[in-house]
Protein backbone atom coordinates (compact mmCIF):
# COMPACT_ATOMS: atom_id res chain seq x y z
CA UNK A 1 0.00 0.00 0.00
CA UNK A 2 1.50 3.35 -0.96
CA UNK A 3 0.52 6.99 -0.80
CA UNK A 4 4.03 8.34 -1.37
CA UNK A 5 4.73 11.49 -3.33
CA UNK A 6 8.20 12.87 -4.05
CA UNK A 7 8.22 16.54 -3.02
CA UNK A 8 8.75 18.90 -5.94
CA UNK A 9 10.85 22.09 -5.90
CA UNK A 10 12.83 21.27 -2.77
CA UNK A 11 16.44 20.89 -1.73
CA UNK A 12 15.87 17.17 -1.05
CA UNK A 13 18.44 15.23 -3.05
CA UNK A 14 17.12 12.11 -4.82
CA UNK A 15 20.16 10.10 -3.67
CA UNK A 16 19.51 11.05 -0.04
CA UNK A 17 15.89 9.97 -0.39
CA UNK A 18 17.03 6.69 -1.94
CA UNK A 19 19.23 6.00 1.12
CA UNK A 20 16.17 6.45 3.33
CA UNK A 21 13.82 4.36 1.20
CA UNK A 22 16.32 1.56 0.50
CA UNK A 23 17.25 1.09 4.16
CA UNK A 24 13.66 1.41 5.40
CA UNK A 25 12.23 -1.01 2.85
CA UNK A 26 15.05 -3.52 3.45
CA UNK A 27 14.20 -3.45 7.16
CA UNK A 28 10.51 -3.96 6.36
CA UNK A 29 11.15 -6.85 3.98
CA UNK A 30 13.38 -8.61 6.52
CA UNK A 31 10.92 -8.21 9.39
CA UNK A 32 7.38 -8.16 7.99
CA UNK A 33 5.29 -10.88 9.64
CA UNK A 34 1.81 -11.82 10.78
CA UNK A 35 -1.24 -13.56 9.36
CA UNK A 36 -1.86 -10.71 6.91
CA UNK A 37 1.61 -9.22 6.23
CA UNK A 38 1.75 -5.67 4.88
CA UNK A 39 4.04 -2.73 4.23
CA UNK A 40 2.56 0.76 3.98
CA UNK A 41 4.34 3.92 2.80
CA UNK A 42 2.88 7.41 2.98
CA UNK A 43 4.20 10.94 2.82
CA UNK A 44 3.02 14.51 3.00
CA UNK A 45 4.50 17.96 2.83
CA UNK A 46 3.38 20.91 4.90
CA UNK A 47 5.27 24.10 4.17
CA UNK A 48 8.97 23.26 4.56
CA UNK A 49 8.40 19.95 6.38
CA UNK A 50 8.36 16.62 4.53
CA UNK A 51 7.14 13.59 6.47
CA UNK A 52 7.48 9.94 5.48
CA UNK A 53 5.71 7.19 7.43
CA UNK A 54 6.52 3.55 6.80
CA UNK A 55 4.57 0.81 8.59
CA UNK A 56 4.90 -2.94 8.51
CA UNK A 57 3.19 -5.81 10.27
CA UNK A 58 5.43 -7.31 12.93
CA UNK A 59 4.58 -9.94 15.51
CA UNK A 60 7.91 -9.87 17.33
CA UNK A 61 9.33 -7.58 19.97
CA UNK A 62 11.89 -4.85 19.35
CA UNK A 63 14.60 -4.46 21.98
CA UNK A 64 15.49 -0.80 22.41
CA UNK A 65 18.10 -1.25 25.14
CA UNK A 66 19.61 2.12 26.10
CA UNK A 67 18.84 3.74 22.74
CA UNK A 68 15.79 5.11 20.99
CA UNK A 69 16.65 2.76 18.11
CA UNK A 70 16.30 -1.01 18.47
CA UNK A 71 19.32 -3.22 18.88
CA UNK A 72 20.16 -5.44 15.94
CA UNK A 73 20.02 -9.20 16.28
CA UNK A 74 22.23 -9.69 13.23
CA UNK A 75 25.96 -10.21 13.09
CA UNK A 76 28.54 -8.65 10.82
CA UNK A 77 29.99 -5.22 10.37
CA UNK A 78 27.29 -3.77 8.11
CA UNK A 79 24.28 -5.13 9.97
CA UNK A 80 22.33 -2.74 12.14
CA UNK A 81 23.33 0.36 10.17
CA UNK A 82 20.04 0.92 8.31
CA UNK A 83 18.25 3.05 10.90
CA UNK A 84 21.47 4.93 11.66
CA UNK A 85 21.83 5.74 7.94
CA UNK A 86 18.21 6.93 7.80
CA UNK A 87 18.77 9.12 10.87
CA UNK A 88 22.01 10.52 9.41
CA UNK A 89 20.21 11.62 6.23
CA UNK A 90 17.23 13.05 8.15
CA UNK A 91 19.59 15.10 10.32
CA UNK A 92 21.30 16.46 7.19
CA UNK A 93 17.92 18.10 6.54
CA UNK A 94 17.51 19.31 10.15
CA UNK A 95 15.11 16.46 10.89
CA UNK A 96 15.07 13.15 12.73
CA UNK A 97 13.34 9.80 12.93
CA UNK A 98 11.16 7.97 15.42
CA UNK A 99 10.35 4.30 15.67
CA UNK A 100 7.32 2.91 17.50
CA UNK A 101 5.91 -0.54 18.01
CA UNK A 102 2.30 -1.37 18.84
CA UNK A 103 -0.73 -3.31 17.62
CA UNK A 104 1.52 -5.86 15.91
CA UNK A 105 3.14 -3.27 13.67
CA UNK A 106 6.25 -1.12 13.52
CA UNK A 107 5.96 2.54 12.51
CA UNK A 108 8.98 4.47 11.24
CA UNK A 109 8.45 8.23 10.92
CA UNK A 110 10.99 10.44 9.15
CA UNK A 111 10.78 14.23 9.30
CA UNK A 112 12.94 16.54 7.18
CA UNK A 113 13.02 20.24 6.38
CA UNK A 114 13.18 20.43 2.61
CA UNK A 115 13.27 24.20 2.07
Regions found by a protein language model. Give the residues of each.
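Conserved ATP-binding N-box helix of the HATPase_c
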Residues: 14-36, 88
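Glycine-rich nucleotide-binding loop
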Residues: 49, 60, 102-109
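Conserved short strand/loop->alpha-helix "switch" segment adjacent to the catalytic nucleotide/phosphoryl-transfer site
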Residues: 2-20, 77
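Glycine-rich ATP-binding loops of the HATPase_c
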Residues: 94-104
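Glycine-rich/acidic phosphate-handling loop/turn and adjacent ATP-lid/helix
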Residues: 50-80
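Short beta-strand/loop element within the Bergerat-fold HATPase_c
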Residues: 38-48
Amino acid sequence: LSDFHYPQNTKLNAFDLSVIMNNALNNCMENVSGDDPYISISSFRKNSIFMITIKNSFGGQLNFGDSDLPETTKSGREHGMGLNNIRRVARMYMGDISLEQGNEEVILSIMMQVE
